Amino acid sequence: DTVRRQRQMCIRDSSNTHFDVIVVGGGPGGSAAAAYNALNGCKVLLLEKEIWPRDKICGDAVGGKSLSHVKELGVLDMIESTPHYVVDSIVFGSANGSEVRVMLPKESYEKMGLQSGYALPRMQFDYMMFQRGQEIVRENGGSVIQDFSVHEIMFENENGVHKIKGVKGRIGGRKSDNDELVFTSAVTIGAGGYNCPVSRVITELHNEPHRDDDHFCGGYREYWDNVEGLGGESGAIEIHFIDEVLPGYFWLFPVQGNRVNVGIGMLISEHRKLKKSRKKSLKKIQKWVIEEHPRFKPRFANSTLVSGSEKGWQLPFGSPRKNAEFQPRRVAMAGAMCVGDAASLVDPFSGEGIGNALLSAKMTSKHFDKTQHTDGFTDEACLLYTSDAADELCR
């Protein structure tokens, strides 16, 4: 019944065809980009290929870089009213077994009315961001369509310059027999993750690589209950650099109650270089750490794996590329900008992507002016956004 109501609302929202801003992807970056541009007076169309709520594979930490945006958009109170874990510190573990606990600057955040950090399942956090984002979009005359598969990014060649003009797609998925819908806009914002169709078209039109495995990280996540030394309402998250996982790390992030997000991340190119004796899937490496590693086996002795939580994904890092014209890669062009993972902005040290997704989302609203860009987001404007994003987020 919920899905039926959502689809009826989507059909109503599909009656408009031209917008100031189209946002492809309704994760935190896309929801924030849609909200910030709507608050600027833009008529926004927010497109999401799934029906919410949906799972998202991640470490589940929401750090200090994100919290001012979470508060500004009215999501902080929503987080506080639902189960969550307050992060006050990070434990770093080395290969030789030594550990150091780094306390987060609690007082600095409290002055701003914030906690130092949160951890909660992305299904929960992303849903709240999307709910608030779509409220702001609709309050400002825009539309939101879920279960919408974008199968074409439309572009034209104007005086030798390619310009993105909008999208084509269908409600119900790529293979749906529903009518094709066409939407146009002055700017299209790509927020569809590491394989975002907008970011792919941007790089393809400029004959540049979209993917570089030296800057892509493979990630694997499970949820476990009752891991020794973790749980409660607040405390540390843990990041361990152990021999069997290098060059990467093993993490333990409590999310609520006694539930812990347990995962492993490693550069894809480095994972491929591992000796045959160690070249296993991330899932198998994590299984060995949990069941055999002398430091972690005892901590999982009385814990339970949450069935169905075993999932993998990829993270595009914002680390500098060799010989690239733009860093970390081209993330905008006439008629389009990308944010978050779609712009390859994941922090290469921590693997955290939400903060840079929200920062880049707000930046799009500063660079797009619906009055100035009535004929479309210009090539000059896209270069300014690209430069500002690199200077602010990839230093």
Where are each of the predicted segments found?
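Single conserved hydrophobic/aromatic residue that forms the stacking wall/gate
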Residues: 1-7, 11, 385-395
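N-terminal Rossmann-like FAD-binding beta1-loop-alpha1 element of flavoenzymes
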Residues: 21-45
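Glycine-rich FAD pyrophosphate-binding loop
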Residues: 39-58
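N-terminal FAD cofactor-binding segment of flavoenzymes
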Residues: 57-95
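Short beta-strand to alpha-helix junction loop
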Residues: 109-131, 276
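Predominantly flavin-linked oxidoreductase catalytic cores and closely associated redox partners
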Residues: 132-295
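FAD/FMN-dependent oxidoreductases across multiple families
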Residues: 270-272, 276-367, 372-373
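Active-site-proximal substrate-binding core of FAD-dependent oxidoreductases
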Residues: 366-387, 395
